[in-house]
Amino acid sequence: MIKPMLAHKFDINRVDYTQPDGYYIQPKLDGVRCLFTANGAYSRNNKKFMNLKHIEMALKPFFEQQPDVVLDGELYNHGLRYDFEKIISLVRKQKPTEEDRRNAQHLIQFHVYDYFSMDSHYEKYQTRMNNLVNSDIYCASVRYVPSYKVHKHEEALNMHHDAFLSNGYEGSILRDGSTLYKHGRSYGLMKFKDFSDAEATIVGYEIGQGKRTGTLGKFLMMDDDGNKFGCPPGKGFTYKDMANMLKNIDNYIGQRATFTYFQRTNAGSYRHPLFKTLRNYE
């Protein structure tokens, strides 16, 4: 089973901006993690994606030359950054129709930010980044996620992170240039963003009131610690979407879901929780 490298939350005590290989910052994409191989594309939990034929064809020449390489990135489209469910609906198709494939070709891109192989396990990120920059794999459906070298935290936070947020990205990823690719969480890869993601189980719902009559008002959710809370649909969901959610509410009850929140209180409750998507695509 292929496992990607995962980020820890940012910890300033683990950063040394003076180390020789440097630190690099990237925009954090709010997409679907994807590992692309010569045999197809897989989720972080090893579920094969079946609706990415256009990307498979674009990468075919690369994998014919380097069949042992695994490209690490995100299925994403910045134009759909407020419509995550649209990406999910196309990515999760296990028996895509021709229309599904056409829509995926038009909307789904693979944004590459790292790679690994048997030969590259001893390559530092700085080397891997330079190899990606000079690769000829990029096209309309395969994009490179740029990295910017930073020399101090104020530069990373005030210049790049703020710019990423202003441009609609969900945060930043800080990479240690000396880090080898690790399968699992690594402090060589740290994330900082204003909102956090978490998972919980949908246990109930409330109907919308006022102008949202006839739609889903909020899901009632329970996290793994037994905390119950209300969670309205977040950005990107239209009245039609929320009406369909209410109509098909039985398909949601009991499901695991991803939600975003701003902070946790001392009592453990979530501030501004918003439903993002069902966690059934990985």
Model regions: which residues?
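Short, well-ordered loop/turn elements at secondary-structure boundaries
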Residues: T18-D21, L29-D30, H106-L107, S166-Y169, ...
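Secondary-structure boundary elements
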Residues: V133-S141, L165-E170, N227
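Amphipathic alpha-helical
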Residues: M1, S147-S196
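Classical nucleotidyltransferase
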Residues: Q26, V32-F36, G40-G73, Y181-E282
